[in-house]
Amino acid sequence: MAHHNGPRKKTRYKFKKDLRKRGIVPVTSLIQHFEIGQSVHIVCEPSIQKGMPHRRFHGKTGKVIGQRGRAWMLTIFDGNMEKIVIARPQHLKAQK
């Protein structure tokens, strides 16, 4: 039997991009800077796998608590439990 339990399982439609949004990711998404305490949305960029958070957190909003290398650390409530998610800036979007 084949192995069916990868980190991107059940994401066929969740990580799908619109037809006109395919291609190279803008450089501005790579060099985003966030302030500590700022609210950000987790929107996974499917064309870049490095630094992608778990699919469970796609579409959630969290607060920035720090930076770890090139990635940002966020706190997110998953049910009643507060969790720390580490994600690169390509997968984050500042809340307006």
Curated annotation (Swiss-Prot):
Annotated keywords: Ribonucleoprotein, Ribosomal protein
Signal peptide feature range: none
Gene Ontology cellular component terms for the protein in this record: ribonucleoprotein complex; ribosome
SUPFAM superfamilies attached to this UniProt entry: Translation proteins SH3-like domain
Annotated Pfam families: Ribosomal_L21e (PF01157)
Family of the protein in this entry: Belongs to the eukaryotic ribosomal protein eL21 family.
Protein name: Large ribosomal subunit protein eL21
InterPro entries reported for this sequence: Ribosomal_eL21, Ribosomal_eL21_arc, Ribosomal_eL21_CS, Ribosomal_eL21_sf, Translation_prot_SH3-like_sf
Gene3D superfamilies: Ribosomal protein L21
Domain of life: Archaea
UniProt-recorded Gene Ontology molecular function terms: structural constituent of ribosome
Single biological process term from Gene Ontology: translation
